[in-house]
Each structure stands twice: as C-alpha cells, then as structure tokens.
Amino acid sequence: MEITEPKIDEYLEDLLPARDKVLEEMEAYAAERDIPIIGPVVGRFLYQLVRLVKAKTIFELGSAIGYSTIWIARAAGEGATVYYTDGDPEKAKRATQYIERAGVRDRVRILTGDALTLFGQTPGTFDIIFCDIDKEGYPEAFRKAVPRIRKGGLLLADNVLWHGRVVEPPQDAATRGILEFNRLIYSSPDLFPTILPVRDGFAVCEKL
C-alpha cells in the first residue's frame, strides 16, 4: 500500500531546490542498491526540526550510509554533536566518506555496532533522538530514549506507517513493533506526538 500518491511525491520532489553533489550522489547510490534513506522531502523536514528546537546533541538510532546524518549535522551547525550508528562496517565506512565530503565530519561521531547497545553506552541527555532501526526494536527504543530527551526536545521516528501494513493483517514482527511504538507514543504522558503521512509515515514527538 502506498501511503501517499506517487505523483504527489514526485510533485513535492520537483519543487525542491537541487541538492549538492554529495546528497545527490547518495540518493542515486541508495536507489541503485535498494538502501532505505529518508529522501530529500523528509531530509528538509528533519533539517527544519533540528533548527526549530536549536538542537546541538542528536543521537541517530540507525544511520545506514549517513544521508540523514548529513541533513542533521548541517542543520545543527558548528559545535554540535551528532551520533551516527550502524551495525554494518561497510555502510559506516561509506558514510564516513560522505560525511567528510559534506564538510561535517567535525561534528559527527561514527559508532559501529548495535544502535541500542551503543546508545546505552553513550552518557548524557539529547535534544533530539531519531529512531530508524529495525522495526522490531522500536518499542525498546521508545523506552530507552524518552527518559534521555530534554524537555522541549524531540523523539523522531521514520516508517511509522510501514507501507500501510499497520492496517493490514497478518502482521509480522516488524509491523507489530511499529504498532506498539505508535501506541506507546500516543499513550505516554511525557510526549506530545504527531504522525505525519509523509512518505512512509514520520513521527514527531515533543518531550513535555
């Protein structure tokens, strides 16, 4: 099931200013190899959110080739700390190259391994935590992330409508993870959540 009409997606992408060479190269690389990335429409939205809350400490749970990392790091600006995480050393190596070429290596910490384990090993609170790991892990990510977001900060999550599978039985483990995550964010007294039907569904949750 398509969450949005493909022609609408095309229309929105056509409206966007051209990305720089690095981001356009990453988009082509991801498309050729079927690597999921947030894409330019959500990338710009993520950039805007980072600027709106003046985020300086951001933890990404799952970063793949670093496409979202670059959008975040550019928005956060100098002096920020953005944590990149991925369990695939090859993806992390490629991401590092892209991040260096994008001019934001000074503010990105590259961590390789299980994202939730790495998160548990990283002290401190965060302005934004962005969840884009395996969907079975979303409920655990919720439980670990919410206590460590500062008041007024954001919990963000991609793929929360999961290609429409949230309304279609039978439901596999990934879909059940998304369903539970969505239930948790809307029942939490600590968050004010909104799910936007953009691309594959994007959750924006303000920490109260």
What are the roles of these predicted feature ranges?
Residues 1-128, 135-156, 160-208:
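A short alpha-helical cap/connector motif
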